[in-house]
Amino acid sequence: MRAFLIGRWQPFHKGHLEIIKKISAEVDEIIVGIGSCQKSHTLTDPFTAGERMMMITKTLENYDINYYAIPIIDIDYNAVWVSSVESLTPPFTTIYTGNSLVRELFSERNYVVKKPELYNRTDYSGTKIRKKMLEGSAWEHLVPEEVVKVIEEIDGINRIRRLSEKDYDEE
């Protein structure tokens, strides 16, 4: 069985890795959708699809997991979004998602929809990790070592800090 899991992975963290490991025990192959692939260089989505692809592939090469990592673009037309995903991915029967809209869209198309159990959401949150990066707090322990290396390679911390700068002084 092949399943689909979509996320923004901004950045890919240990909670994401645990979810993928659990799903891989249930299915033969996982399609890891890199959602909102067109977004980057914002505080919410600082990393490009290619950078997120590196984070995922460099991490998962250390595990016996059969997967495809595929960029998925937002089309802002919910009624046809599932068809867009289908055109970009190998066939699959099951989707894992915590997003209620995505669950609804795939349910309406008769997919088996499962909600993955989040892993230690208190610590493993992309929002919290990006905030720690911005503040200069320790964040490296929250992501796989390979992700730390990718973020260092692309100078991701300084990118996030530059993105947070105001364009002018407020009076």
UniProtKB/Swiss-Prot annotation:
For this UniProt entry, which residues form the secretion signal? none
Name the enzyme's class.
transferase
What EC number(s) has UniProt assigned to this enzyme? 2.7.7.1
Q: Name one GO molecular function term.
A: ATP binding
* GO cellular component terms, A-Z: cytoplasm
Q: Which GO terms describe its biological process?
A: NAD biosynthetic process
Instruction: Using the record for this protein, list the coiled-coil segments as residue ranges, or answer none.
Output: none
Q: What InterPro entries is this protein classified in?
A: Cyt_trans-like, NMN_Atrans_arc, Rossmann-like_a/b/a_fold
| Pfam families per UniProt | CTP_transf_like (PF01467)
Q: What catalytic reaction does the record list?
A: beta-nicotinamide D-ribonucleotide + ATP + H(+) = diphosphate + NAD(+)
Where found, per UniProt? Cytoplasm
Where does this protein act, in terms of pathway? Cofactor biosynthesis; NAD(+) biosynthesis; NAD(+) from nicotinamide D-ribonucleotide: step 1/1
UniProt KW Transferase keyword? yes
SUPFAM superfamilies reported for this sequence: Nucleotidylyl transferase
Checking Gene3D superfamilies in the record gives:
HUPs
Q: Which UniProt keywords apply?
A: ATP-binding, Cytoplasm, NAD, Nucleotide-binding, Nucleotidyltransferase, Pyridine nucleotide biosynthesis, Transferase
Family from the record? Belongs to the archaeal NMN adenylyltransferase family.
State what protein this is by name.
Nicotinamide-nucleotide adenylyltransferase
Q: Which organism is it from?
A: Methanococcus maripaludis (strain DSM 14266 / JCM 13030 / NBRC 101832 / S2 / LL)
